[in-house]
Amino acid sequence: MGPLIAIVGRPNVGKSSLFNKLIGEDVALIADYPGLTRDRNYSGCKIDNSNYILVDTGGITNSSSKFDQLILAETQKAISDADGLIFLVDSSSSINQLDFKINDILRKSGKNYVLVINKSETKESKNNISDFYSLGVKNSFEISAKNGLGMRNFKTSL
């Protein structure tokens, strides 16, 4: 079908919203609270005449609870299986240590990945966006998975 691309990030940064936007259907459930996505969710999609398989993953946390460790294991499997990765962050909140931890996990995976700075349409993002560039990811894009802002430029990069 095409390369496998995993969407990875903290809980509630918009991974499922981006997944739905890219595949063009509301397949993944979306909520205003973290932890709804637990298992990997796969779907094929076509972007600019290229076929992809996308994987929506649960959010990576610092929690040591058994439940969160199971979600982390599922996400690590998706990272391992993927041909490329989308690191999704939420610019409506400040960058934090978990963003740096996830960036380190992705860098150590040896896979190609892009930084996608979501929720860039929010007032809060104006104060936070520049901080995410400190992660040092070569290819970075500012988007809104909710309203489509910046999606064309981002999709061209895939």
Across the structure, where does each feature detected by a protein language model lie?
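Conserved strand-to-helix beginnings and helix N-cap segments that scaffold or border functional pockets
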Residues: D68, N96-F100, K126-I129
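Canonical P-loop GTPase G-domain recognition
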Residues: K111-V114, K119-L158
